[in-house]
């Protein structure tokens, strides 16, 4: 399976969480600045992975996908929701669709509630846009996992969360960063931005950071789980 990313940009063993910090506050869903236009996003490669990750969150969000050792040497279970939040925050990335960001923020806020089940929570969510999307994500029982070739046993996605979720995250991050870089270059050619030194420098700094993320993800893709 593809190795998750760590905060210092070195691979961890599969099954470890990326710079996991359960107490880290999750940023508000409207704080993410993207250069990718909302229009036409559904046709983009990153959007396919974004939706698959969201499907994992709504279906299996509270499920433990791996353990991580804390500073005291204790094994701490990490849920799908915690893993996704931590992995995105590490590179200051987020989902592109505002509704998807809202769902992830809600999931992160309630993951430690007693008896929390992502599927039940989002199906009963008062905002009809969220509950409707949740129905779509849950009712479409599309499996990324295939038959095991030797035993013909069906391996479920839930049994492979420890490898599927990191692989989806690597594919998503590479795709969305590549798209952001393209639109950043266009933004820098806009005279209004090119003539504003502060804006220009801020974009150039972020561009440099994203190029580094892109490079790391490109290396990880060489060892990825094959996904459709």
Where are these regions (language model features)?
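C-terminal tails and terminal domains of large nucleic-acid-associated
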Residues: 166-228
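Extended acidic low-complexity intrinsically disordered regions
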Residues: 1-2, 204
């Amino acid at each position: 399976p593809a190795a998750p990313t760590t905060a210092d940009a070195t691979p961890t063993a599969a099954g470890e969480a990326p710079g996991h910090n359960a107490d880290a506050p999750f940023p508000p869903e409207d704080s993410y600045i993207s250069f990718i236009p909302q229009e036409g996003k559904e046709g983009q490669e990153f959007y396919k992975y974004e939706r698959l990750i969201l499907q994992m969150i709504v279906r299996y969000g509270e499920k433990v996908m791996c353990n991580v050792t804390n500073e005291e040497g204790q094994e701490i279970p990490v849920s799908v929701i915690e893993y996704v939040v931590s992995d995105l925050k590490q590179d200051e990335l987020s989902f592109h669709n505002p509704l998807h960001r809202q769902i992830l923020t809600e999931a992160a806020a309630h993951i430690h509630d007693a008896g929390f089940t992502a599927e039940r929570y989002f199906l009963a969510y008062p905002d009809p846009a969220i509950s409707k999307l949740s129905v779509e994500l849950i009712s479409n029982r599309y499996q990324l996992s295939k038959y095991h070739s030797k035993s013909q046993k069906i391996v479920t996605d839930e049994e492979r969360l420890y490898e599927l979720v990191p692989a989806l995250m690597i594919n998503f991050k590479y795709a969305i960063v590549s798209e952001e870089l393209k639109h950043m270059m266009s933004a820098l050619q806009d005279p209004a931005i090119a003539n504003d030194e502060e804006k220009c420098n801020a974009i150039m700094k972020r561009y440099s950071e994203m190029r580094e993320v892109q490079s790391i993800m490109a290396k990880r893709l060489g060892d990825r789980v094959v996904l459709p």
